[in-house]
């Protein structure tokens, strides 16, 4: 697995710079190394984890494809600056599994399936809310004035006699 390098004494303030440094491949003297677990801790502490689909893709990229692709996805995630504290534990579990040797592949698969279910539920909720917003209730028909009908009926009865 790859490691991210931060060229600063305050990594909490410059975490996106750490990912950018990793992507560019530049080196520095006072390096702080980031493992995928440390990346998750930074993301959760900065409250920038949401977009579980991107998290899922990044974890798969970190585990299967290449650390650089995973880091690029993480950079996009950090740049989004969106927050969802409820999903941070799922994100942390995914990246912890992606960065470590997998002892039990069933747990890894379970976490990915769980994340996919959460993503689909969030997407369904967004679609449902958009549909609810676009379909406006139709106006009820105007109330019928019974007095007019009664007058017309009375006139008809009067003239028909």
Swiss-Prot record:
Topology of this chain in the membrane: Single-pass membrane protein
Residue intervals passing through the bilayer: 102-129
Localization in the cell: Host membrane
GO CC term (a single one): host cell membrane
Keywords per UniProt: Early protein, Glycoprotein, Host membrane, Membrane, Transmembrane, Transmembrane helix
Residues the record marks as carrying a glycan: 14, 87
Keyword Glycoprotein included in the entry's annotation: yes
Name of the protein in question: Early E3 17.7 kDa glycoprotein
């Amino acid at each position: 697995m790859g490691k991210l390098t931060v060229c600063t004494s305050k990594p909490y303030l410059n975490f996106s710079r750490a990912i950018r440094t990793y992507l560019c491949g530049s080196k520095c003297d006072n390096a702080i190394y980031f493992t995928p677990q440390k990346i998750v801790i930074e993301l959760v502490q900065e409250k920038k984890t949401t977009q579980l689909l991107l998290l899922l893709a990044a974890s798969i990229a970190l585990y299967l494809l290449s650390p650089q692709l995973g880091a690029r996805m993480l950079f996009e995630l950090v740049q989004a600056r969106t927050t969802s504290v409820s999903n941070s534990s799922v994100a942390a579990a995914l990246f912890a599994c992606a960065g470590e040797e997998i002892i039990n592949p069933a747990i890894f698969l379970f976490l990915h399936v769980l994340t996919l279910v959460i993503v689909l539920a969030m997407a369904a909720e967004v679609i449902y809310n958009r549909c609810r917003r676009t379909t406006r209730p139709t106006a009820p028909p105007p109330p019928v004035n019974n007095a007019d009908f009664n007058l017309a009926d009375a006139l008809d009865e009067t003239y028909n006699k």
